[in-house]
Amino acid sequence: MTNWLGTLFARAMDAGVRWQLGRLPVELPAPGTWTPADPHEFWAASRLRDPAPIAVGPPLEHEVEGVELRTLTGPSRGPGSDLGSRSLVATAHLRPGRRDLPFVLVVHGLLAPSPWYEERQCRALAEMGAHAARIDLPLHLRRRLPGVRSGEGFISADLSWTRDIVRQSVEDCAAVLAWARREVSDRVAVCGTSLGGLIALLLAAQLDLDSVAALAPLCDPAETVLDRLPRRTRRAVGLDGGRGGVWGPDRDSARMVIGAALAPIVARSFQPPATPGERIAIVRPTLDEVVGDGPMKELAADWAAELWSYPEGHISVLNVRGLGVRVREWLVSRHSAMAGRAQRAAPGQGSWATA
């Protein structure tokens, strides 16, 4: 594919994503929903140090020799009140009795209609000889609200809601990782795409993990809100024409308010991250028109993380030949900064293996 045709294809795919985002219902936030929050206090009040317990269901099938497919469930706490907001769910591909193999958690993006990409990654990781799991974020997939599309309602003009549901997502993933560290493997890793990339980076900021890969991550939600929202959404919240909407008289005022409110879910608020930068890889599509590539480059520099740049868009980067293999090899590899750093929980009895 010639360069100009590839660029056109990448931009067309990103335009389709922006069109979908622009079709989401928008409600003006109530006063007081954009109060500033201290990033460190915000996460100190989380469940990261006291993760929810995980229950493991019976084996569903043996798709690959030596691999068991299990459903993971557990309690969840967040701003929503529906059933899907109160319980987490994940699907794991496990190799019983093999603590020596790494465990990789795969996290999907915003509005994911199905887990096809994440399931494909899990199957490929299992075939490589790893444990793997994919998790459904609040309001997505098996946790969606009845009668609405997957992911609708996750991102809101109510900034306190948005930061709280992102924290809930990080807590849910942390619960699965804590279980995996205790029951499954001595090494745990995370891979996320777009919104899932943000979740992966926030996990890296707060927890000492063995390997992290973030593909086209939403590194700076505040900047994306101000500079990347679809035109229809910008008009609905009053951010068109240089205005600041409900957050201020102009864009500069709104930038300060939104930045202070969403600071806890901006990865670069945390320096240095709990996971050393040598274990973190950020995949940067330089043509990204959905979240923008600038914050990815800045974060990689701030954290001294690996930066893999491709002349692709937010969606087309997922189809780059060889990238999937490169990411999977990164996730299962032992990195030079790993020795003695990641906290090791005492191995459990692995009771799931006989359930």
Pin down the residues of each PLM region.
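Gly/Ala-rich beta-loop-alpha elbow adjacent to hydrolase catalytic centers
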Residues: C191-A200
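Conserved acidic catalytic loop of the alpha/beta-hydrolase fold
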Residues: V170-D186
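Hydrolase active-site cap/lid region
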Residues: L202-A254
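Serine-hydrolase catalytic core
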Residues: P249-A342
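Cap/lid segment of the alpha/beta-hydrolase catalytic domain
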Residues: L111-P115, E119-R167
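N-terminal targeting or regulatory segments adjacent to alpha/beta-hydrolase or S9 domains
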Residues: M1-R77, A345-A355
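A short loop-to-beta-strand scaffold at the N-terminal edge of the catalytic core in hydrolase folds
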Residues: D82-R95
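Short beta-strand element of the alpha/beta-hydrolase
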Residues: D100-G109
